[in-house]
Amino acid sequence: MSIASVASVFKGEHAVGSKVTVRGWVRTRRDSKAGISFLAVYDGSCFNPIQGVVPNSLDNYDNEVLKLTAGCSVVMTGDVVESPGAGQAFELQVTDIEVAGWVDDPDTYPMAAKRHSIEHLRELAHLRPRTNIIGAVARVRNCLSQAIHRFYHEEGFIWVSTPLITASDCEGAGEMFRVSTLDMENLPRTEAGKVDYDKDFFGKEAFLTVSGQLNAETYACALSKVYTFGPTFRAENSNTSRHLAEFWMVEPEVAFANLNDIAGLAEAMLKYAFNAVLTERMDDLTFFAQHVDKTVIDRLQSFVSSDFAQVDYTDAVEILQNCGRTFEFPVSWGIDLSSEHERYLAEEHFKAPVVVKNYPKDIKAFYMRLNDDGKTVAAMDVLAPGIGEIIGGSQREERLDVLDMRLAEMDLNQEDYWWYRDMRRYGTVPHAGFGLGFERLVSYVTGVNNIRDVIPFPRAPRTANF
């Protein structure tokens, strides 16, 4: 006898007639007049539950099996047999079943058989992974994570763990969470009446990071190809389906690379990850196609078979101005493209993923390399049909004098970036990288539109439960 996951049984890894033990939770119980109960038991290893056929000859049939309800946990041992019913190849002829945990009151169990709205499930984040939709999201999220790590490993990248606590504002936007151990009821003050951060834990102001990029750049300038994959934080008071206060970012940095190099890297990474999901998680994708967004499978297959289009920002603005479409936000050179502009370019004009390059410097961050025209920077966004921007990146400014000029233009203090400036003083090198918002990627793959539903415990304005 061996411990088996539901997925391993369905994959045929256990011979017909072999005895296995499956451990999981009851989704449904159905009783027949012939004295047999049919239990649908899931363990999270795949989308479908396995059917356990339980005879009334078991000693605990009357006093336990017939009392099982949705959510009860069981340890079920039996023989693997071919299933006569449609929908699954194998089932379990149960010879022994142990109840590991009961549901106290089945009538009030929040995850009972009735369907809940996805909005309601957010209020039950500790129980929602038991539902079909959130369980499927979790498996797809894991598949994408593993594929991204695998991709960078195969490409010779080194994974760098960048700090979550920082004194630098990577984006220069100031929307950062402060980290402090000072007594909020009795703050120390300077003679000028300002908060005295010399008395704080780090002896200075500290924040939760908005990006691991600046730290990753230092490692790229020694190890050539690195990436970060971890949580980042934005204190942006946005209550929308596209914003979280805590989210995960994938950020590669490559030495001796330019904008075209990382555009190619972004394309290769996305196609690798999408192919992994199409290969490994078709059961979950089929569910999403049936119940969430019927286009998800076709969209991913189309994405991996499409060549990325490329267009300069200036040309993209001209396309949008001359397309005959009236947009909610009018288009003019110098504005940041909105979601409706991005989706028009990807879905209607190019009908493919598109890389928009060379944005106006005034709407981009200080670290992006200034182009020879003095007006634009070597920045790029990858726009995907169905969602818009999915990746943002740039060639980094490797020239110290130009970097200092950009810091001054954006009213940022050189002293706060002394270590970042050092990289331009000691063997500077052209380098480039990008950031991928991981939750936005999961949303794109699953068709689940609100990114609060593709992260286990969402953090947003006035939302920090669990």
From Swiss-Prot:
GO terms for biological process: asparaginyl-tRNA aminoacylation. The keyword Cytoplasm applies. It is found in: Cytoplasm. One of its GO terms (molecular function) is ATP binding. SUPFAM superfamilies: Class II aaRS and biotin synthetases, Nucleic acid-binding proteins. Its main location: cytoplasm. Its EC number is 6.1.1.22. The keyword Heme does not apply. Keywords: Aminoacyl-tRNA synthetase, ATP-binding, Cytoplasm, Ligase, Nucleotide-binding, Protein biosynthesis. CDD domains: AsxRS_core, EcAsnRS_like_N. GO terms for cellular component: cytoplasm. It catalyses: tRNA(Asn) + L-asparagine + ATP = L-asparaginyl-tRNA(Asn) + AMP + diphosphate + H(+). Belongs to the class-II aminoacyl-tRNA synthetase family. Homodimer. This is Asparagine--tRNA ligase. It comes from Shewanella baltica (strain OS185). The lineage of its organism: Bacteria, Pseudomonadati, Pseudomonadota, Gammaproteobacteria, Alteromonadales.
